[in-house]
Amino acid sequence: MEYYCGIEIIEQLTLDCCKVMVASVKPLNTSEMIEAVLARLSPSRRDKTMRYRHLKGKALSAGAGLLLDYMLHDYGLRERDMRYEVGEHGKPSLKEHPELHFNLSHSDTLVACALGQCPVGVDVQHIVTLRDSLVQYTMSREEIDALNAMASDEDKALFFTQLWTLKESYAKATGRGLTHEFPAFAIGSDNKVKALSRLTPPATFRLINLQDAVAAVAMKY
């Protein structure tokens, strides 16, 4: 394992147009540690972190900033020098480096970052407990049929979590986020997007299976 300023890098993947990393923020377990690492980050990230009331939220926000900072080193940049702007649907970008695209995600004690030279979206989720409302919100009819054909609850939970992270990453890569209606498109076994009710931009995907969690990255082209 590799450590950087209080986060533990647990997975990294280099793809054609981006790099993806997942880290644990468990070491950021005191207010003093979080305050110390915030001194390394941008005013925007510090303000965002301090808006969280609880230690867990602050650790995730600071950890996401640290992971982005770590990955920006590849380009000779530091997060503390970054200024951000926000797109129409709320997706942030690096104001002075439009050639670089990034996206962040967090779940429980994990943070994920995708950074590269194509529009990217990343999502990380711990394996979820299935609820019908989530299934209906997330899945197309054919995906629900595939889910119902599975024998074990464990297989169903993993399949659903994988599909959810793939769809979240895709929605974030397109910049539309939660405005994207997830049942309006399906993701096949070949990891290709299939538009069900409207034109949907093409993308490629990668899944990262972690212990009790799943991460996914989408690269729009």
Q: Where are the predicted features?
A:
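Core catalytic alpha/beta fold that binds nucleotide/phospho-ligands
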Residues: M1-Y221
